[in-house]
């Protein structure tokens, strides 16, 4: 079955019993604020261009958000590095196939991500394997923890109210 969403690159995650689930704190759910603004830590919106790399762009944004929240040194993650490695997991390197969010997050948990200055977002290179130096440097920037948010309105609001963004997907037609 083909799950590809035309042109934009998101593929739905299939259920996986190994997912670590996030549950918003009960006390947070009991007192959800009317409004939550996480924008002070949000990076500038990325432009994926004509490449189906939306999951890599969203994951890079979450990484950059988290680094800002932790007051770590400025770092723009390499979206092309993430896109290559999530497609490597899915065995689709030779095509602009899009990817599952889970595989992109899995790749930054296992391999990390190098700076975009080291592996720039040059669409023509999307099939090219990043350099060995990129992989060595990426290990310094591995995701330590990631969890799947239960797709209910209260859990999504609780996640945001707790100060955490989430990587989400939307079909664009």
What are these regions (language model features)?
Residues 1-77, 96-116:
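Structured alpha-helical subdomains that flank or immediately precede key functional sites
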Residues 3-8, 29-32, 61-64, 88-173:
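Predominantly the structural core of cysteine protease catalytic domains
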Residues 75-90:
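Acidic helix-start/capping segments at beta-turn-to-alpha-helix junctions
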């Amino acid at each position: 079955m083909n799950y590809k969403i035309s042109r934009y690159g998101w593929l739905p995650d299939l259920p996986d019993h190994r997912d670590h689930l996030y549950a918003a704190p009960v006390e947070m759910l009991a007192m959800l604020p009317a409004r939550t603004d996480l924008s002070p830590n949000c990076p500038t919106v990325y432009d994926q261009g004509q490449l189906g790399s939306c999951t890599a762009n969203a994951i890079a944004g979450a990484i950059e958000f988290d680094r800002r929240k932790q007051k770590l040194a400025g770092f723009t993650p390499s979206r092309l590095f993430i896109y290559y490695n999530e497609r490597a997991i899915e065995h689709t390197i030779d095509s602009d196939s899009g990817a599952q969010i889970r595989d992109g997050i899995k790749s930054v948990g296992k391999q990390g991500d190098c700076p975009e200055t080291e592996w720039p977002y040059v669409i023509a290179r999307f099939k090219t394997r990043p350099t060995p130096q990129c992989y060595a440097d990426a290990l310094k920037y591995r995701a330590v923890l990631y969890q799947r948010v239960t797709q209910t309105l209260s859990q999504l609001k609780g996640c945001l109210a707790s100060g955490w963004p989430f990587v989400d997907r939307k079909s664009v037609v």
